[in-house]
């Protein structure tokens, strides 16, 4: 409350009477009502309701053409004319966001991707930057180009840690030690500035707030948790949106608006909150927030993908919402690790979640799979059978008996729309990570015997990688680090712990030799990363207990 009282003293008047000064409450772009073809267009309410009519909530929604407004009836009845006018102006959103969020009318062309350089145009040289990376999909989303920049003061922030670890202890103590050594060993970056947090679970939020400096920018890909983090900070420290003009002057909301933090804190937060959505690239402009005594900037997400294909074109909308909405993640999988069993077959038996990928174990292998991706799983005789079933599901308009297992659209109901990847040799367990989708844990059981490489077929345009199981890796590394008083590294130095996969031709029979060939090509300019290049591949895989993770190599 002290922070809020301080904010109320000397607060600068913020006029809501001229709508052109207001930004879209969802994407932060400047609103305009002149040209429907240009960004920021909104439909102006025809008129404000007459206070004598005591309108209900549905009337207000109609005036905003179903835009995002959640006023309580009690607040309206107290002073309908005043509160309705102010809240309409503060919560109005542009036509693009309204269509996408409330009418399921999503046009990818209206949500253009931005590059890193596009976004850095918003960030002055020498600024404090928080590079936001979802830990659940590590190492995907981690951008060395951001961490290595000399013109920025960059801190790595690993979000969604509750989707990897059982409790806060590992996140607070063990992750920073591991990441310091990982960055040094893998990327030659010497940095102590790493935080692992969970905005939903409030893990390390106080520590994060105490650390970040005034005028800090949040930088990362779309849907990595920037807005969720901001909203957690706003609630915890009574934060609010501010405007900063070209001279650096901070324009805060009016005293009347700020007073609502006392009288109606729930509605106050709804007005001030950052727009959180499962839709990527929703944020189109920089939005500044006053969080306690500090200014924090939410930047639009940037893309590093070379593919023009979007998940919205491939995956069913309902499935995609489950994949992207962090609050829907079921943490019981982290604690219980319930697995499904699958045996590799001579017909190419496969495991899938919604048709988003097809995992094909080698013949005779016995596998356990722990799924951290929402949606029911299904096994098929082979990939062709799975694709045929899901094609029928799309043609049946939901009446097919297996429709609940189908999470893809008809555009990828052909085998040619998938890429075949070979997973480099491993022993024990690995985690397969799909960018913007999630991960699964794959474990081979029984006495080790090489039976062939595992394969995974993925729609073109989706990025994939593997890692050693992250929680166990960090826990065991920390134990080793403590027992040796820091002499032993928390992050293994004797082997790579992450790797890209190797694309194979659909008819490639000798995948092991093909993997070695691709490995040599990928490491041609990184000779120091090469391992076991003189070993025969088939001899090498007989001794994985001693020669771990051969042909593992991650391309940043």
Curated annotation (Swiss-Prot):
Gene Ontology cellular-component annotations: mitochondrion
Residue span(s) of domain CP-type G: 113-305
SUPFAM superfamilies according to UniProt: P-loop containing nucleoside triphosphate hydrolases
Gene Ontology MF annotations: GTP binding
PROSITE patterns listed in its UniProt record: G_CP (PS51721)
CDD domains found in the cross-reference section: YqeH
Places the protein is found: Mitochondrion
Role according to the record: Interacts genetically with prohibitins and thus may be involved in the mitochondrial lipid metabolism.
Family statement: Belongs to the TRAFAC class YlqF/YawG GTPase family. GEP3 subfamily.
Name of protein: Genetic interactor of prohibitins 3, mitochondrial
Organism per entry: Saccharomyces cerevisiae (strain Lalvin EC1118 / Prise de mousse) (Baker's yeast)
Chain's gene name: GEP3
